[in-house]
Amino acid sequence: ISMIVNNKEVKNFDVRLAIHKVDYFVPVDLSVFSGKTVSFKFKMNSNDPIRVNLSPDNTACCKEMKLSDTFDTTNREKFRPTYHFSPLYGWMNDPNGMVYKDGEYHLFYQYNPYGSKWGNMNWGHAISKDLVNWEHRPVAIAPDALGTIFSGSAVVDHNNTAGFGAGAIIAIYTQNSDRQVQSIAYSTD
């Protein structure tokens, strides 16, 4: 799916579209585009023989797609853990860059916010004061022109050794597209 805002593609992500029955919904936050024209362009996988003759117009997912100001994230899934951390929706993998700063533990993890399987790799983010109760935060690092976000690590730079500011959280990670590159991101807030 390509997200197009005012005739410009701003995001691209892979989604498993429900053909006959919708098993789950995936939210896409449009609030940052308030007042702008947003459209979605679907490209079906032509190599999949099941989908060759289908279009978004005759699929269950598009018939049930809707705008909403809220998204129910109540954990109703039979196999989703209740004691160990898991995201509100989507798929997660290995934790990356766990740090402690100002009385809070920060957990970063590989995350697909658009499906229940591997893909669309972002770094999810959650914080906790006790490592049991977690507050979900917005995606920390999202794919860009260099690719999706793979494994890495993070540190708190208490002494400003990197020059980004004392106490900055610095993440170093692999990005993947047609080749892999090493990237760095930092936050001072």
Label every PLM stretch briefly.
Residues 1-20, 26-189:
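Beta-rich carbohydrate-recognition and catalytic domains
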